[in-house]
């Protein structure tokens, strides 16, 4: 995902999407949650750096967020800062391997992956990915591998989580964005510049399929309903596409807001989410595997295009900042971005 240190195009689509034992929850929960999402609080975090992916550590009740050169950790019970992982240069994404009690960050600036202790946050080692500018990163507990998706080299690096060594490289034929796994050996990743989803085997590292996503353009965020085998991908042309995870067929599309960049899915409520840079959160209900409808458009704040979902509390987290007026255009920068106002970085807590 592209990230600007001042006005980021952040794609957190949702961190690890986990199936829940609550997936059979009744329609009353979905109806109540869908109709009442709102920004319950805004927490000013300040500090330096832009931002990119967010991910919720459900076991530790923490929210991890990339901040340009460091990775900030928030206690989701108090919304306060409880840790900061230093020296993650150009950090984009964060992933967790609960079975190993380890976490991982993808560091775009030096094309590396930092391995850290998930409990203490202490760094363990740094792995050079052999790809250029790792962006999204996910852990697959089926193969016990970490997958880092390299934006500039158009490939993925598979890392053996037990040994912290590179297990292989996977050419993707384009710029990868977010990815999800099903826990059974299959991984899906958006290929942004090709408007495709690639399907991978996490054991053999073979690319099994490339699926065109038309009418979806430039997909970024991606989420998965493991029960219905449906992918939710969000697109730059204000669409969410629902895709059959087994054959790649686009079964439905729904409108989102401008600047859509991140996606999430709550298995308990069957709600899918798209966070939009215009300052809205689109909430979609999955009625059946092939039908869905928009149930709410939640006002958030301009720039809040990256998000994470806590599937236990059903809370959505987004981040943004305040921005000043854009500088005057130049030949080199005909459309300059507005600068972020120092110390204005803010966490939005969006509750049902």
Regions found by a protein language model. Give the residues of each.
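Bacterial N-terminal signal peptides that target proteins for export
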Residues: 2-14
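Intrinsically disordered and other compositionally biased segments
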Residues: 6, 20-21, 149
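Bacterial N-terminal signal peptides
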Residues: 11-24
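Predominantly soluble domains enriched in secretory-pathway, periplasmic, or organellar proteins
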Residues: 24-352
């Amino acid at each position: 995902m592209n990230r600007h240190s001042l006005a980021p195009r952040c794609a957190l689509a949702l961190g690890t999407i986990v199936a829940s034992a609550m997936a059979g929850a009744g329609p009353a929960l979905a109806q109540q949650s869908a109709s009442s999402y709102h920004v319950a609080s805004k927490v000013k975090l300040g500090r330096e750096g832009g931002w990119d992916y967010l991910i919720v550590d459900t076991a530790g009740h923490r929210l991890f967020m990339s901040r340009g050169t460091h990775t900030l950790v928030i206690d989701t019970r108090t919304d306060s800062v409880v840790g900061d992982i230093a020296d993650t240069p150009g950090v984009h994404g964060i992933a967790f391997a609960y079975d190993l009690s380890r976490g991982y960050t993808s560091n775009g600036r030096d094309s590396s992956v930092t391995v850290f202790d998930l409990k203490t946050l202490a760094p363990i080692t740094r792995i050079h990915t052999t790809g250029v500018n790792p962006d999204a990163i996910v852990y697959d507990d089926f193969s016990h591998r970490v997958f880092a998706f390299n934006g500039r080299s158009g490939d993925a690096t598979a890392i053996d989580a037990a040994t912290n060594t590179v297990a292989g490289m996977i050419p993707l034929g384009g710029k990868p964005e977010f990815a999800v796994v099903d826990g059974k050996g299959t991984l899906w990743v958006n290929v942004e510049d090709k408007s495709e989803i690639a399907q991978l085997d996490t054991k053999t590292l073979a690319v099994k399929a490339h699926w065109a996503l038309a009418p979806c353009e430039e997909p970024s965020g991606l989420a998965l309903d493991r029960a219905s085998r449906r992918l939710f991908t969000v697109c730059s042309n204000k669409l969410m596409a629902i895709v059959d995870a087994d054959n790649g067929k686009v079964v439905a599309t729904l409108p989102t807001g401008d600047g859509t960049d991140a996606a999430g899915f709550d298995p308990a409520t069957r709600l899918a989410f798209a966070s939009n840079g215009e300052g809205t959160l689109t909430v979609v209900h999955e009625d059946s595997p092939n039908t869905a409808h928009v149930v709410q458009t939640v006002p958030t704040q301009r720039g809040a295009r990256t998000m994470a979902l806590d599937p236990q509390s059903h809370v959505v987290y987004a981040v943004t900042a305040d921005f000043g007026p854009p500088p005057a255009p130049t030949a080199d920068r005909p459309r300059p971005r507005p600068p972020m106002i120092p110390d204005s970085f803010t966490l939005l807590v969006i509750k049902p």
